[in-house]
């Protein structure tokens, strides 16, 4: 794995295209604007706007590291890339011979697509709020559709809230966050139908102090359970002696008396499918969102760990029932992308 905050511009686009074309023609694999069939390992680069320790990005990074350890990819990444620099870093990786570029396009949707259009022989797989475009065949999208696991954590949270006052703190009210909050709230209502919700967004993907201060305010306003969509929330919960629900990653090891349950996002099914398609030369404009769902192994409820045996049995019975129904297709968690509101 190579960490590459910035890449040299030593290889020009003309030289790169000539080299790639020659190699592909030699192998008999050149197919014009279609992403090339790749030999192992696939040169894969990731562009992240936040540190790799951040919840969401850490799951992509983890999957990429695992793929490199298997020998499937040769992985480089840039973290803390500003939105204004994002397209530039994408181009630098493209000019340096990378076959697959992954990352998050939420704040640079148009710019990312423009870069992909310039490099039709490279496969791009980026987190996005929008669907793929047929006229951009090398640009696929993904998202964290872990609403099933979020719903299950809500069932648990509702059963453990004495006050019925629950706080939810997120980064931005975008569909990727909104749907998880709504699913969590729906789960809460299963075991605590009269629950009240305080909802707030801190306007950042990585600002633990801001998340912590927002959590303090909610606790002061009566919340005894917090949905920690961002880092910092569980710190406040731990300090004030209230409970929290984790999102995307399992942080219970750091908060053993605070984090009751977590909805886990596994990026491996998404990345592995992209790797398979790049190898086969079949990568195309596609929505990979389904690979984040529980049925595909992209989401799961983390083990209760220190809270095993502390959740009411009735709630756990419902969790197991719903989990089985989700896996069989008999229950579908509603996907609501509208901004959630306090009530």
Give the label of every model feature segment.
Residues 1-31:
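N-terminal secretory signal peptides
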Residues 133-156, 168-173, 256-269:
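Short beta-strand elements at the ligand-binding edges of bilobed clamshell
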Residues 10, 32-45:
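C-terminal segment of N-terminal export signals and the immediately downstream linker at the start
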Residues 98-105, 125-127, 221-231, 247:
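Periplasmic-binding protein-like
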Residues 64, 150-195, 199, 287-309:
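An alpha-beta-alpha
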Residues 43-70, 76-86, 106, 173-179:
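Extracytoplasmic "Venus flytrap"
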Residues 279-343:
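Hinge/cleft segment of the Venus flytrap/periplasmic-binding protein
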Residues 117-143, 248-258:
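Flexible loop/hinge segments that line or gate small-molecule binding clefts
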